[in-house]
Every structure is written in structure tokens, then in C-alpha cells.
Amino acid sequence: MKNQILLLRIAGYISLLFVVFHLFFYPMFNWENALNGLSSMNRAIFLTYHAICILMLLFMGIIPIFQTKSLLGSSLKYGILSLFLLFYLIRIVAEFTLFGISSSSPAILIMCLVPMIFYSIPLFSKQTIK
């Protein structure tokens, strides 16, 4: 049980690191100019989805860090942790299918694989918290 709490909190902190990283995307990728090639509608959709992604990552960090025992003790853990797991699984698949293999791929793979595994362990554990 203590291991599950530790794993979820580590995964939560990694998710919060992704929040910080994503907050720098706008200047890092020069989106002010780079997104000018998109129609105003596609630009708005892109930026909206990015904001939602940041919010989702924030949720994926805060809940496991501050509500770990509540999460593990609830039947909602199956839905919530499955969603977290799928989020990172989709990101891993996207790394190779949409972005292509690059020099940063191993780092992204590891940074996504660790929380994906850590979020999945409580799903398959028989331990329960009351």
C-alpha cells in the first residue's frame, strides 16, 4: 500500500513537470509566429486543446499527490487511473506515429512510460484501502 502511494505521488510529480514544460511551449516553439500559417479557427482549436492538455496534466498531478489515499480507497480509481494510463499511452504512440523518431524520443518515452506504469500498478493490485 505504501508502495502504491509512493508510485502515484512520483507519477503525479512527473505530470506536474509536464505542466511546467507545456507552459513554456508558446515561447519555446515560437507559436506566435509558427501558428500564423493556420486558419484562425484551427489556431484557436490548437491553443484550446493545448490549454485542456495542461489542465489535464495538472489534474493528473494534483489528485495523486494530495488525494492519494482517497483515490486508492475509491472505486473511482479504476476510471481515473485508467484515464491517466491511456493519456500517457496515447502520448507514447503519438511520439512514434505523429512526431517520428528523433533524438528526444528516448527521453519522452521514459518520461511518459514511468507515470503510465506507476498509474497502472494500483489498477491491477489486490490491495485495498478503507
Task: Describe the function of each predicted region.
Residues 1-18:
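Cytosolic juxtamembrane helix and N-cap/initiation of the first transmembrane helix
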Residues 114-130:
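Membrane-water interface at the C-terminal end of transmembrane alpha helices
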Residues 13, 17-26, 41-69, 82-88:
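Core segments of alpha-helical transmembrane spans in multipass integral membrane proteins
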